[in-house]
């Protein structure tokens, strides 16, 4: 069954923009997107050089936000392709005031565009 669009989705995503990694300019073809890399600078994104853990398919963010709360010395990146779902994860991170978690609203096939090789400590 298809999930209904959340009310005020665009406004809610804008309110959580500090937790969302921009994917502007993402091409429709994943192979083209991978060739045209736009690697994330983790030190710039998080403001530190801590290890980075990736969760693919983070859903509503319960697991990743709890991990980020328990381990402030680790940076977390959650990936979820559905904006309708990722907004809930971003709101949880914002409510928990978790500076060590960010979200990428994209399909896992596009990750090689954003994630530098051998830069993730754990998936």
Which residue stretches match the model-derived regions?
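Conserved short alpha-helix immediately C-terminal to the canonical SAM/SAH-binding motif I
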Residues: 85
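S-adenosyl-L-methionine
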Residues: 1-54, 62-69, 91-118
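Conserved glycine-rich SAM-binding loop
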Residues: 59
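Local beta-strand N-terminus motif with an aromatic residue
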Residues: 50, 119-121
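Short beta-strand element of Class I
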Residues: 74-77
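Conserved beta-strand/loop positions that form the S-adenosyl-L-methionine
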Residues: 56, 79
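Conserved SAM/SAH-binding beta-strand->alpha-helix loop
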Residues: 82
């Amino acid at each position: 069954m298809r999930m209904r669009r959340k009310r005020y989705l665009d406004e809610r995503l804008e309110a959580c923009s500090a937790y969302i990694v921009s994917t502007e300019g993402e091409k429709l073809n994943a192979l083209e997107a991978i060739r045209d890399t736009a690697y994330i600078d983790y030190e710039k994104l998080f403001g530190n050089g801590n290890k980075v853990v990736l969760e693919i398919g983070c859903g509503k963010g319960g697991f990743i936000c709890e991990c980020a709360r328990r381990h402030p010395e680790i940076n977390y990146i959650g990936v979820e392709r559905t904006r309708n779902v990722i907004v809930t994860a971003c709101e949880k991170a914002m409510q928990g005031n978790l500076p060590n978690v960010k979200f990428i609203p994209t399909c896992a096939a596009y990750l090689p565009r954003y994630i530098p090789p051998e830069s993730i400590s754990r998936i």
